[in-house]
Regions:
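Extracellular/periplasmic catalytic domains that process cell-envelope and extracellular macromolecules
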Residues: 53-55, 69-73, 98-103, 169, ...
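Histidine-bearing beta->alpha loop at or near hydrolase active sites
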Residues: 272-277, 287, 291-298, 310, ...
Length: 492
């Protein structure tokens, strides 16, 4: 196994083109909050042939690392570019070639045949709008109703056969990953040709509900189970002409593969840095959901590494067509310590399990109104959780008085804390400390700001989203779509 060595590039910070053509013949690199590139890999080879056999010539790019051993059956990864991109562009906007250097697998980066747009299926009600020609030349290519007549799908199938002829490919370890429109292409291939792949991964580019589900809620396509990975960017936006709530769109795409793969158990959730990962184990295949905090449309440069480490590295399709899990390069485990609540939920996430609370979590605003002639300014908004739940979670003994209007805690290490309705102050080890906001009595339960409590009395690092809190023993940042996932898990 070889080691990864990053190659320096020449930054072009003045660039504003989506895919600068000069990158192909230089060492230029670009960085944007959605696309970050590497210099053009010297071993990347371009091909231009009629490989499908229908008279049309296609471009594709093969990367065979120096670490490739022709004596060993070798995994194969297809990586599919987004709209207005190319195969070589997808190569440099990912780290697949670096991971291939270390692991020894082969990569193929095909280019869409026409206009740098794949022939993808789209929602029937959007086909006319999304296929309408416009001055910007940003519209979908027409696609045949019969997948067997889809040129781009046939290109990928033909490339698979070519790679098996030319290299020692492990037929049980063929994978596909795509970005944006490439994710849509990957998902289309998964719906029709999953039997040829062990796992499919994608970043951005989710489909609307009407493409995935029938009116009765059953999947529109009876796809063969396949390990699936979906990465979402927190700052991404819905596709043009899509009026659906974007959080719902993300959830529908997640639910599709959970149903196809038979994932009914609770996921294992792990957050680190700006990454949120949820690992679902299914009766037929597994599913991984990833959300990236503060990221725009595209794919992160380390997406390939994460997909390999937590998904592709540990799955193959057996000779009988079933999915076989062999253990991933990195463990798909829960955070060792985790406490999470979402506004409006009476249940909480604690160390990989769901716990009931005495009341639902809610948001409380800290206001400034002095000197504003009757007006007010919201200076902060905090998720409030029942003190009884927080005490139980950290192993503290609770002594309540006056109908829970005053509560004292004895912490596991012998420390003490006392809280009272309407007081922003808490008494911690016989000293006054200000919380983020005052304690609130609701339905007979005393509530305190959850993040403040876990940071100050449990020594955890708490991250807040718009209406959720996730606390653990390391630095992380809770994102919008992980919060939505938690809400879906915790709602009654």
């Amino acid at each position: 196994m070889s080691k990864i060595v990053l190659r320096p590039g020449d930054p072009n910070d003045a660039n504003r083109d989506y895919l600068p053509e000069a990158i192909k013949t230089s060492q230029m690199v670009v960085n944007e909050n959605g696309n970050n590139s590497q210099p053009m890999p010297p071993r990347l080879k371009e091909f231009h042939e009629d490989i499908v056999g229908d008279g049309l010539k296609d471009y594709w790019y093969e990367y065979v690392p120096e670490s490739y051993d022709p004596a060993k059956p070798t995994p194969l990864v297809f990586s599919i570019h987004g709209g207005l991109m190319t195969g070589w562009g997808q190569c440099i906007y990912t780290s697949w070639t670096y991971v291939a250097d270390r692991e020894g697998f082969i990569c193929v980066f095909p280019s869409a045949h026409a206009r740098r747009f794949w022939q993808i299926m789209c929602e029937p009600e959007l086909k006319e709008v999304l296929s309408a020609k416009n001055p910007e030349d940003i519209y979908l290519n027409d696609f045949p109703e019969d997948i067997r007549e889809n040129h781009d799908a046939n290109l990928i199938l033909a490339l698979l056969e070519r790679m098996k002829r030319n290299y020692n490919i492990d037929e049980g370890r063929v994978y596909m990953q795509g970005m944006s429109l490439g994710n849509a292409m990957t998902q289309m291939m998964a719906r029709f040709y999953a039997h040829k792949f062990a796992a499919m991964a994608g970043s951005a580019g989710p489909a609307r509900k009407t493409l995935l589900f029938k009116a009765d809620g059953t999947p529109e396509f009876q796809s063969l189970p396949v390990d699936a990975w979906q990465a979402r960017m927190e700052l991404d936006q819905p596709a043009p002409a899509c009026s659906d709530d974007y959080e719902d769109v993300i959830a529908y795409n997640r639910d599709y593969w959970l149903k196809i793969n038979g994932c009914t158990a609770l996921p294992r959730i792990r957050l680190f840095g700006e990454n949120g990962l949820a690992f679902f184990h299914g009766e037929k295949a597994d599913y991984v959901f990833r959300d990236v905090k503060n990221r725009d449309h595209g794919q992160t440069f380390d997406d390939a590494e994460l997909v390999w480490d937590y998904c592709f590295s540990g799955v193959r399709r057996g000779a009988d067509g079933t999915i076989v899990h062999t253990g991933t390069a990195l463990p798909t485990e829960n955070d060792t310590v985790s406490v999470a609540c979402v506004a409006g939920c009476r249940r909480a996430w604690v160390n990989g399990e769901i716990r009931s609370m005495a009341g639902e979590a809610f948001l409380w605003q800290k206001l400034k109104y002095h000197g504003l002639q009757g007006n007010q300014i919201v200076r902060g908004e905090y998720l409030m959780a029942p003190l009884s739940f927080l005490a139980e979670t950290v192993g503290a003994a609770l002594d309540a008085e006056d109908g829970n209007r005053s509560c004292a805690l004895t912490l596991p290490g012998g420390g003490t804390a006392q809280f009272a309705q309407g007081s922003i102050g808490a008494v911690v080890d016989d000293r006054i400390v200000s919380m983020d906001c005052e304690a609130v009595l609701r339905e007979g339960e005393l509530y305190v700001p959850m993040a403040w409590f876990l940071r100050n009395l449990a020594g955890l690092q708490a991250s807040c989203s718009r209406d959720g809190v996730y606390a653990t023993d390391h630095e992380t940042r809770l994102s919008t779509h992980i919060t939505r996932l938690l809400r879906d898990l915790l709602k009654d």
